[in-house]
UniProtKB/Swiss-Prot annotation:
Role summary: Catalyzes the deamination of 5-methylthioadenosine and S-adenosyl-L-homocysteine into 5-methylthioinosine and S-inosyl-L-homocysteine, respectively. Is also able to deaminate adenosine.
Membership in a protein family: Belongs to the metallo-dependent hydrolases superfamily. MTA/SAH deaminase family.
Keywords annotated in UniProt: Hydrolase, Metal-binding, Zinc
Molecular-function annotations in GO: 5'-methylthioadenosine deaminase activity; metal ion binding; S-adenosylhomocysteine deaminase activity
InterPro entries referenced in this protein's UniProt entry, alphabetically: Amidohydro-rel, Deaminase_MtaD/DadD, Metal-dep_hydrolase_composite, Metal_Hydrolase, MTA/SAH_deaminase
Organism: Teredinibacter turnerae (strain ATCC 39867 / T7901)
Keyword Hydrolase: yes
Residue sites binding Zn(2+) per the record: H72, H74, H221, D309
Cofactor-binding details, from the entry: Binds 1 zinc ion per subunit.
The reaction(s) this protein catalyses: S-adenosyl-L-homocysteine + H2O + H(+) = S-inosyl-L-homocysteine + NH4(+); S-methyl-5'-thioadenosine + H2O + H(+) = S-methyl-5'-thioinosine + NH4(+)
Any Pfam family the entry gives: Amidohydro_1
Named cofactor requirement(s): Zn(2+)
Listed name of the protein: 5-methylthioadenosine/S-adenosylhomocysteine deaminase
Enzyme class: hydrolase
Length: 442
């Protein structure tokens, strides 16, 4: 009698893209999962012969890869999808977004918008997302219920909102939320100062001290428009990036979101600091904010990850669309068709994202011992044939709607395109109610 090893899941697929090692692709293999961890990748013939499995899932013509990591967004703002379009950032924020948020942002808005965002992200292959928004306690509760993975960056601004009245209160509430979820397996909480133009020196200096003491990340919109740079030079005599560096806020724990206005000196400063750049190409394109020089950044060793930004400015949370835009936009900006190749674009949405959020040892690739955050993509559709190169199809075709199954920490959250922990019907009904509420005030 042959001895066999017992395992929880065997996902038997036509292709497995582990991301690490780089450019490796397995054919006709199985991903073995034990509890919440990846056990190994073996030929399917070996899985059938040597393993007793609790559940075997056959995925012919499908590809397995790590779940995508959306490194910047505002989940609640999914309720503002299409609310204000075709205008520059300052007009969009000051005349449309901030006024409606002042009236409506609250726990119900954050919960309903967050659930809508999570449903969209899960169905398009995102398993972990970073979020910066008010009422983080409401989103954290929704994330826990959904079983998704999240990095929550509590916002700090100089002005009052429905959530807090002063920078000190934002920090106090944020640290309380961080303490609440300190031991949660799927949720982490860090600092999210909104931007250099909305947070003064004193709060930023306090954040630098706290972040250093707590070894906490700092997530900030930075160098998003030419006007931001010009205003900073006029007021402070320096560019925003240098201002942060002078305060001790530019470290390997810093996320510089957008970075569309970037000089050679900025790139050198980023590279020397170890800070991460979060590239949001589709939002930047829509707002005409500028272009992030991803090829130049990566050539200098800067880690570049991807985010969708909020659906209010994108208008989609599909990370496959984002990584495609990153690849195409990166080639155009560099003037080089070989810049940001398909594998590099996928790395930005997976292992680079894991590096940025400090979870490289747990997420971002299908390696033994890592968390079983896995997605399956159906490659059987006619418009993908012939599949000469599955990785090319992942990046250069429309892929998000082809995600068939999703696991987070070994738990199946999408099964044959159906959500298992969230209710489509309830989420759609809530979104319709918000459309009526928000539309009545326009």
């Amino acid at each position: 009698m042959t001895n066999t090893t017992t395992i929880d899941y065997s996902l038997d697929a036509s292709w497995i893209l582990p991301v690490v090692p780089h450019q490796r692709l397995f054919k006709d293999c199985s991903l073995l999962i034990s509890r919440d961890r990846i056990h190994s990748i073996v030929p399917t013939s070996q899985s059938l012969r040597d393993y007793t499995v609790r559940e075997r899932i056959s995925l012919p013509g499908q590809l397995l890869m790590p779940g995508l990591i959306n490194c910047h967004g505002h989940a609640a703002m999914t309720l503002l999808r299409g609310f204000a379009d075709d205008m520059p950032l300052e007009t969009w924020l000051k005349e449309h977004i901030w006024p409606v948020e002042a009236q409506w942002a609250g726990e119900e808005f954050v919960r309903d918008g967050g659930e809508l965002a999570m449903a969209e992200m899960l169905l398009s292959g995102t398993t972990c997302f970073a979020d910066m928004y008010f009422f983080g306690e409401a989103l954290a509760s929704a994330v826990h219920k959904a079983g998704m993975r999240a990095q929550l960056y509590f916002p700090i601004v100089d002005f009052a909102t429905a959530w807090a009245q002063s920078p000190d209160e934002y920090i106090h509430k944020g640290l309380k939320l961080r303490d609440t979820y300190r031991s949660h397996p799927l949720i982490n909480v860090h600092f999210g100062p909104h931007a250099p133009y909305t947070v003064g020196d004193a709060p930023l200096e306090r954040i630098a001290v706290y972040a250093d003491e707590l070894h906490a990340q700092v997530h900030i919109h930075l160098h998003e428009t030419p006007e931001e740079i010009e205003s900073s030079i006029k007021e402070f005599g320096k560019r925003p990036l240098q201002r942060l560096a002078d305060m001790g806020l530019l470290t390997p724990l810093t996320h510089c979101v957008h970075m569309t206005q970037t000089s050679a000196e900025d790139i050198a400063l980023l590279a020397n600091s170890g800070a991460h750049v979060i590239h949001c190409p589709r939002s930047n394109l829509k707002l005409a904010s500028g272009s992030c020089p991803t090829a130049a950044l990566t050539q200098q060793g800067v880690n570049v990850a991807l985010g969708t930004d909020g659906a209010a400015s994108n208008n989609s949370l599909d990370m496959f669309a984002e990584l495609q835009a990153a690849a195409l936009f990166g080639k155009l900006v560099a003037g080089d068709a070989a810049a940001i190749d398909a594998h590099s674009a996928i790395a930005m949405a997976t292992i680079n994202g894991a590096k940025a959020i400090g979870l490289e040892d747990q997420l971002g690739s299908l390696e033994p011992g890592k968390q079983a955050d896995v997605i399956a993509i159906d490659m059987n559709d006619l418009d993908l044939q012939p599949v000469h190169n599955p990785v090319s199809q992942l990046v250069y075709t429309q892929m998000g709607h082809r995600v068939s199954n999703v696991w987070v920490a070994g738990e199946q959250l999408v099964k044959s395109r159906d959500l298992t922990t969230l209710s489509r019907k309830e989420i759609a009904a809530n979104a319709a109610q918000w459309r009526e509420k928000l539309g009545a005030k326009r």
